[in-house]
Amino acid sequence: MSHILRAAVLAAVLLPFPALADQAGKSPAGVRYHGGDEIILQGFHWNVVREAPNDWYNILRQQASTIAADGFSAIWMPVPWRDFSSWTDGGKSGGGEGYFWHDFNKNGRYGSDAQLRQAAGALGGAGVKVLYDVVPNHMNRGYPDKEINLPAGQGFWRNDCADPGNYPNDCDDGDRFIGGESDLNTGHPQIYGMFRDELANLRSGYGAGGFRFDFVRGYAPERVDSWMSDSADSSFCVGELWKGPSEYPSWDWRNTASWQQIIKDWSDRAKCPVFDFALKERMQNGSVADWKHGLNGNPDPRWREVAVTFVDNHDTGYSPGQNGGQHHWALQDGLIRQAYAYILTSPGTPVVYWSHMYDWGYGDFIRQLIQVRRTAGVRADSAISFHSGYSGLVATVSGSQQTLVVALNSDLANPGQVASGSFSEAVNASNGQVRVWRSGSGDGGGNDGGEGGLVNVNFRCDNGVTQMGDSVYAVGNVSQLGNWSPASAVRLTDTSSYPTWKGSIALPDGQNVEWKCLIRNEADATLVRQWQSGGNNQVQAAAGASTSGSF
């Protein structure tokens, strides 16, 4: 596919940007956001099974190093379970995408079981967490010759109980999927255990670093928390709660609540981040200035940190190929750059849609924004302030390394109008409709030239042979290298010459630094597999300097 070759070439010529430590752990409120430093790529679009039938896993394997080099720390994979469904309606047709699966066999329309394992291994080896899409609410119960057979009348299905309407009944604690005939009773011990065991299998056998839970309006959020606790408690998770206030019955408190309140309540109960449909609704129905009303713009950091922001996905947006995909709630083209500039410079965990990144020409722009986010140290819970008195949206975002001033569709003349200190321009696109400035006189990664500024130093660790779920990190005697703490070490993400691992890390200019290579588990920082033996590596930080170690 030509776009893959082009992406690889672009990644090779772009300058490397500072890597940040891959933080593990839950939020202060116990939410599984894996440290709050993820940038996620949605690794498919709706028509993948028609555009690249039985070959998508191979494509992901081939592009693993490019995905890592582009700055993504995780990839949202398609549903891995077998789906041979098909449908036609008014001249349109589809099926096989995974959302009407019939068993847990991995030989499906994205590729084979072996190809999936190879793709997961390549992605994990490149330092990209694999997050599987999972669909516990419903399955294709009528498909013949499936490996999961659940008879009617034993409480396995929603319609085994009286079903008075589209709300919980005695065999289902959520909404129906379409008419409800295919809805599973996830509260039944056998059904609960079936999914618990499969999530554990995906983690142990297929490199899962987390899960995206589909259609969570169909089952209790507490069930998601239990599944994660029982099978993958230290992993990342996110729920898709696409249900506005007016869709709840009049007697439900959520009928008069805000989008933010509804999705935050789900996150509180599931202990997982949640897709920021509060922001998506404002993107669709409000002005750019209204984007501040997303969950990621909430004044409370406990709200911001659970927001998983996105512009479009396989459901809401267009896809290459047949019928343009689903496009149920697609953002207008004229706002796509502004939207990515916002989610990639603001709090929350951003998700980039595959087709925006690799099919439709936004890739260079998105790479630039990822570099800005990483260099500034913007995280899920970073502070954000909005400034009135200007057109469009104007915000100040406080990263751990730099402050960003963001102006979208705005008449703001310069960052000094809303923030003190010196700033340099980082992004200016769409005829000035997208502008981002960062504090300091340079990029924080090698172009400052001033005493005490940060400069990019090239790190290399040789002979870093790892198992699935582990990566090579640099750790050392400065805060940028974790002060010798493995939990705060910096993951090296360039594995194009595996088992050599490389990365560019921002260090204080002129600082004498001592450091070592180590191998540790990505999800559990306490699982250190190997330290580099011998004396410490040494380097004096200077722009473009190189340093290496070896196992």
UniProtKB/Swiss-Prot annotation:
Protein residues bound to Ca(2+) 2: 137, 172, 175, 183, 218
This enzyme's EC code(s): 3.2.1.60
Species of provenance: Roseateles saccharophilus
InterPro entries: Alpha_amylase, AMT4_domain_C, Carb-bd-like_fold, CBM20, Glyco_hydro_13_cat_dom, Glyco_hydro_b, Glycoside_hydrolase_SF, Ig-like_fold
Annotated GO CC locations: extracellular region
Chain residues that bind Ca(2+) 1: 22-23, 34, 37-38
Residues the entry annotates as binding substrate: 99-100, 138, 177-181, 212, 314, 326
GO molecular function: alpha-amylase activity; glucan 1,4-alpha-maltotetraohydrolase activity; metal ion binding; starch binding
Family label: Belongs to the glycosyl hydrolase 13 family.
Catalytic activity as recorded in UniProt: Hydrolysis of (1->4)-alpha-D-glucosidic linkages in amylaceous polysaccharides, to remove successive maltotetraose residues from the non-reducing chain ends
Domain CBM20 as annotated: residue spans: 449-551
Catalytic-site annotation from UniProt: 214, 240
Name of the gene this protein is made from: mta
Official protein name in the record: Glucan 1,4-alpha-maltotetraohydrolase
